[in-house]
Amino acid sequence: MEMKKKINLELRNRSPEEVTELVLDNCLCVNGEIEGLNDTFKELEFLSMANVELSSLARLPSLNKLRKLELSDNIISGGLEVLAEKCPNLTYLNLSGNKIKDLSTVEALQNLKNLKSLDLFNCEITNLEDYRESIFELLQQITYLDGFDQEDNEAPDSEEEDDEDGDEDDEEEEENEAGPPEGYEEEEEEEEEEDEDEDEDEDEAGSELGEGEEEVGLSYLMKEEIQDEEDDDDYVEEGEEEEEEEEGGLRGEKRKRDAEDDGEEEDD
């Protein structure tokens, strides 16, 4: 597949301005030159063109935000000065497996002031005597050559290396994600537990008060019922007494009349 078609495929219905990473490995460069890549990819930070039969960087567009460039397994032999002009913020450059033979070719990379890591594996230049010492002396801005620093310490993973410049932002994000300091959640939990205990105490007090009110209410009602019954009994007793009095009065009047009748009979 030609590079131009590969780019259109990798866009995936996005505009070039939205693309930050672009992988064009194993496609075909017509006449060994870059095709289909232009200045509209202004947000591009990572570009990979490995094994695409690339021989010239002359048509590389301006990519000011580009930080990582993969150009391994091509047939590039020179013209590296274009990189400093078009990609001034490069931090990582992989030229492994190309046709780079001389230190003079690599010298053009001195103007890449932000370059930290350079790979030249399987290039003829690696066969030079004191190759590593010469490269570190020539390109004093780089920290890692072919994956190791001058003390033979291995370079970190590419992702960690890519994040070096953004460590401060990452720390801030981690702090935000970490949330409140240690002990803060425990204090909150203790406060919540205290609030819950207070609520429970209030509920218990309320329930006790409710029970007391119920007891008072029941006793009051019972007293009222008893009083009503007593009043009813008094009313019944009073009624019976009145009836007895009336009956007694009637009997007295009868006796009086009987006595009067007896007196009249004696007079006769």
Swiss-Prot record:
PROSITE patterns attached to this UniProt entry: LRR (PS51450)
Basic and acidic residues bias: start-end ranges: 248-259
Main location: cytoplasm
Location in the cell: Cytoplasm; Nucleus
Region ranges (ZID domain): 215-268
Biased amino acid composition, Acidic residues: 149-216, 226-247
Domain of life: Eukaryota
One annotated Gene Ontology cellular component of this protein: glutamatergic synapse
Start and end residues of each LRRCT domain: 123-161
A biological-process GO annotation: chromatin organization
Keyword Nucleus: yes
Keyword Lipid metabolism appears in the UniProt entry: no
LRR repeats by residue range: 18-38, 43-64, 65-87, 89-110
Region described as Disordered: 149-268
GO molecular function terms noted in the UniProt entry: histone binding; histone chaperone activity; phosphatase inhibitor activity; protein folding chaperone
Post-translational events: Phosphorylated. The phosphorylation is nuclear localization signal (NLS)-dependent.
Tissue expression remark: Expressed in peripheral blood leukocytes, colon, small intestine, prostate, thymus, spleen, skeletal muscle, liver and kidney.
Record keywords: Acetylation, Chaperone, Chromatin regulator, Cytoplasm, Isopeptide bond, Leucine-rich repeat, Nucleus, Phosphoprotein, Repeat, Ubl conjugation
Pfam families to which the protein is assigned, alphabetical: LRR_9 (PF14580)
Cross-link position per record: Glycyl lysine isopeptide (Lys-Gly) (interchain with G-Cter in SUMO2): K68
Family of this protein: Belongs to the ANP32 family.
Domain notes: The H2A.Z-interacting domain (ZID) mediates a direct interaction with H2A.Z/H2AZ1.
Described function: Histone chaperone that specifically mediates the genome-wide removal of histone H2A.Z/H2AZ1 from the nucleosome: removes H2A.Z/H2AZ1 from its normal sites of deposition, especially from enhancer and insulator regions. Not involved in deposition of H2A.Z/H2AZ1 in the nucleosome. May stabilize the evicted H2A.Z/H2AZ1-H2B dimer, thus shifting the equilibrium towards dissociation and the off-chromatin state. Inhibits activity of protein phosphatase 2A (PP2A). Does not inhibit protein phosphatase 1. May play a role in cerebellar development and synaptogenesis.
Subunit field text: Interacts with the importin alpha KPNA1 and KPNA2. Component of a SWR1-like complex, composed of EP400, KAT5/TIP60, TRRAP, BRD8, RUVBL1, RUVBL2, ING3 and ANP32E; the complex does not contain SRCAP. Interacts with H2A.Z/H2AZ1.
Official protein name in the record: Acidic leucine-rich nuclear phosphoprotein 32 family member E
Protein species of origin: Homo sapiens
